[in-house]
Amino acid sequence: MKRSNVKELRKLAARIRLETLKVIHSRGFGHVGGSMDLADLMAVLYGEVMHFDPKNPRDPDRDWLVLSKGHAGPAAYATFGLMGFYPMEDAYTLNQPHTRFPSHTDRKLTPGVDLTTGSLGQGASTAAGAALGNRIDGRRNRVFCVIGDGEADEGQVWEAFHFAYAHKLDNLIYFIDNNGYQLDGRTADILDHGDIAKKAAGFGLYTQEIDGHDVQAIYDAIENACAKKGVPSCIVLDTIKGKGATFAEPKREHSSQPGEETWQEAISAAQQALAALD
């Protein structure tokens, strides 16, 4: 990937972080931690990798994103707004009456959302089903699925990996957001997965582990995965929960409800981070 593209993707990630904060701020509270740490991945997917048409979100030949950790919806809403699926301001109605932007993603409400998620683990399975269905239909598109490391407590995730391997779904790439924390604390203290990359590889998936905030590394890992034939892939993203949110990153918070002054400080810091990339 060209150096100029890397710079633009870093800017896009910074914009996604800023807009994610604004989206959640519109409600006053929400899932900041697990949304902010996905900005770099979302920037690479929608800024460089995926085939999609904002004017035709149901294009049958589009690439799919299944945000299995559906509570990170604000990161998706920010990305879709920046990509032109709808005016960005529309997403500033997060979780409010009659909104199209619930806290967890819903394909019937929000343009750009491919599958409804939120019940942890289920997105891993539905992504595998979508990948198999697309292959049966003769389509050459890909399905990308994002799973949280805390979500991987669910046995359904590993059953989905087994299914994907058994059906040789090489049009399916899983990402594990390995930020080390979940709702109730450190993942290692609640249900220790050990070496989660090694575990995914043990289910037969072509597995890579990378810095989840390095856009070049993310792009290269996706390129490697796309080149693999006959097996599904898993990319473990080592991330920092709450990355870029001044009040959430130090505490690795899952959900946050700061005061207005704290919100404004965080938004200002995100604006400065974006400006520094110009």
Give residue ranges: language-model regions.
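Structural motif
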Residues: 28-36
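Thiamine diphosphate
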Residues: 112, 116-227
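Glycine/aspartate-rich loop-and-adjacent alpha/beta segment that forms the canonical ThDP
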Residues: 215-278
